Regions:
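Short loop-to-beta-strand transition segments
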Residues: 130-145
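Short, internal active-site loops enriched in acidic
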Residues: 27-28, 146-148
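A structural-propensity feature for long, helix-poor, extended segments
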Residues: 147-174
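Hydrophobic alpha-helical positions that pack around
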Residues: 9-117, 129
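Short amphipathic, charge-patterned alpha-helical segments
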Residues: 118-133
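Alpha-helical elements of the RecA-like P-loop NTPase motor core of helicases
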Residues: 4, 74, 123
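A structural signal for short secondary-structure junctions
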Residues: 94-95, 107, 134-135, 168-173
């Protein structure tokens, strides 16, 4: 990179960070819902409100507010760099792109992983996670956070995408 390019990027980063505010919310699970989140940031009780209006119409401090999961924002630079055709070429036609999973618990390889949508649970646990510790048998996994669901050994070949998981009563969390 040229010095001029690096200086340009640093100025952009400085401009972005000078407008960034970090707010500690109430921490309640319900504050993941958009209207509850905006209420919490405003110093009010983090309770979901009746819609309409939606947050894109009237959100934070009464102004239109776009709320997305940090994972969504993390995908933007690569989509801008490579284009939408590149991004939609990853994953499945119905669930394009990648998904981050926190691989934790009784597997050999733990960590945050990013995989194409449509990968199977078996591939995540055994190929990436290295299988169950101490050669023990797989029993079940909780997916998608508190409301995501539990999958058993008979569901190891389930595809990790929105439609496939919905069909078996589970969901991918944020």
């Amino acid at each position: 990179f040229s010095l001029r390019y690096v200086q340009f990027e640093l100025r952009l980063l400085h401009d972005l960070l000078s407008h960034l505010h970090i707010n500690r919310g109430a921490g309640a699970f319900v504050c993941g819902e958009g209207s509850a989140l905006t209420a919490s940031i405003e110093g009010k009780r983090g309770m979901p409100r009746v819609k309409p209006p939606r947050t894109v119409e009237k959100g934070l401090f009464g102004k239109p507010t776009v709320l997305n999961n940090v994972e969504t924002y993390a995908n933007v630079p690569m989509i801008v760099k490579h284009g939408t055709d590149w991004y939609t070429g990853i994953g499945t036609p119905e669930s394009p792109g990648t998904k981050a999973f926190a691989l934790t618990g009784n597997v050999n390889n733990t960590g945050l992983i990013e995989v194409p949508m449509g990968i199977t649970l078996r591939e995540i646990i055994f190929d990436i996670g290295g299988g169950i510790r101490d050669g023990k048998k797989f029993k079940a996994v909780q997916i998608g956070g508190p409301s995501g669901g539990c999958l058993t050994e008979s569901q190891l070949d389930s595809k990790m995408d929105f439609d496939s998981l919905t069909k078996i009563g589970a969901m991918i969390g944020s």
